[in-house]
Amino acid sequence: MIQTNIGYNKKYEIIWLVSEKRKFRNQNTGNVKFVTAENKYGWSSPLAYYYGATAGFFFYSHNSAGLNRYRCKGQTVVNLWHGCGYKDAEQGKKKQNIKPDFDYALVPGPVFVKTKSGLWNCEPDRLLMMGYPRYDWMLHPSMSKDEILDSLFGWKGKKVVLWMPTFRKSDLGGCAENEIELPCQLPAIQDMNELKELDSYLREQEIILIIKKHPLQTEWDENEQEFTNIRYVAEALLEKKQIKLYELIGISDGLLSDYSSVAVDYLLLDRPLGYVLADYNIYKEKRGFVFEDPLEYMPGEKIYNVCDIRKFMKHLTDGTDSY
């Protein structure tokens, strides 16, 4: 939105409400400002409230932080949201009879108009079936596959599978996922020996498995030195290398996911997709799903153990994709 070749900044004054303003000191785009909102101490600049109240258009993704609670008449509020997947709303946030704080919200397609209009207690015509801005990075990465792999790991010319497990353990209080016990942080993996054996198999198949750490997941206990073809990636590394997560997704040859919205997003690429469902029953009990039968909405291989992961990798190398 701040790219000058698009030209929005010539028509509008653009205000970005950011938690770390210092990161944008080198941004010198005309008619664009950065204002502190919800920094690490929870503080927001008075300017954030001013612009939040007086802006003609107010966009947010996770929550508005109340910055536009006193908005002026005529302001249009758009909830960009952060993805529609298979998870049900967290306990305590279901069927609340509250008025939504937006005029419009984005969803990937018609099936999610029904689920989100029920969750947010809003009219279906408020939900715009436009997908999410992050799709642009996935469909049109600014770097080539080899450039991204070389920047992150010094690799080139490898087949890449990205594994993006949702969180099971986090520091967030009241999360139903915290009650889910797994033998390993990675669902479908029983212990480190299985992971080492998988690493050996990946080496034979000449596939790199990149495991993206969920930012809410705690208790990661990996030792990359023990592997040749498995690597872990966190937000900090991507930020350091100036690579967007959805660019990394966009250059991958296949994806392992589970109940997250990234699996829905990945359908746009029409590439091999595997759903890791080792804890499906307990997840359904603790968190629940938005669909009565979520398996009907999962057009990819169903994976329950490490043998299924190997099958997925084998299918990737020989070009088998039943979906």
Model-derived features with residue positions:
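Conserved catalytic-core segment of nucleotide-activated headgroup transferases in glycan assembly
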Residues: 1-6, 13, 134-226, 303, ...
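Donor nucleotide-activated moiety binding/catalytic core segment of transferases
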Residues: 39-55, 215-264
